[in-house]
């Protein structure tokens, strides 16, 4: 008897993606979008198969992601956004609810939903994670979405 191994490939060819991105802190969010698009194209995907959907803020990401998932148009969804800690508890509430909501949509979805929302202590950390010192987390989230979309197709 042989053990069967199933895993996804990193080939984005023929896959359709929705990038759901919050506009708040857009100068950083746009860098995440650029990283995600770069990843998909580098892995054989086509820019014509990518739809960028913008919503006001991170709190709206789960509902917009759910709507995109229910449309049946996409093989995977990449959520992107930036939540930076301020001097009030607002950060904790928004970060927790956005994360929980996106995770819930991911559990309901028949397609993969990857998480590329930055939750940082300050602006410098956000900039570092959007394409400078710490890589681009949009790229990383898209890479996970590619692998998961191919994995889902095998299950």
UniProtKB/Swiss-Prot annotation:
Active site residues per record: 90
CDD domains registered for this protein in UniProt: Lumazine_synthase-I
GO biological process: riboflavin biosynthetic process
Transferase as UniProt keyword: yes
Any one cellular-component term (Gene Ontology): riboflavin synthase complex
Domain of life: Bacteria
HAMAP family given in the database record: Lumazine_synth
Name used for this protein in its record: 6,7-dimethyl-8-ribityllumazine synthase
Native species: Chlorobaculum tepidum (strain ATCC 49652 / DSM 12025 / NBRC 103806 / TLS) (Chlorobium tepidum)
């Amino acid at each position: 008897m042989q053990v069967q191994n199933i895993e996804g490939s990193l080939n984005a060819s023929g896959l359709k993606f929705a990038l759901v991105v919050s506009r708040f802190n857009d100068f950083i969010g746009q860098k995440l979008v650029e990283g995600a698009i770069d990843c998909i194209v580098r892995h054989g995907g086509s820019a014509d198969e990518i739809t960028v959907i913008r919503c006001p803020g991170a709190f709206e990401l789960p509902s917009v992601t759910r709507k995109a998932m229910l449309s049946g148009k996409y093989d995977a969804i990449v959520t992107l956004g930036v939540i930076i800690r301020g001097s009030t508890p607002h950060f904790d509430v928004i970060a927790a609810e956005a994360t929980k909501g996106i995770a819930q949509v991911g559990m309901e979805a028949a397609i993969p939903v990857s998480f590329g929302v930055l939750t940082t202590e300050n602006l410098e950390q956000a900039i570092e994670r959007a394409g400078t010192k710490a890589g681009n987390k949009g790229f990383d989230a898209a890479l996970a979405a590619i692998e998961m979309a191919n994995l889902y197709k095998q299950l």
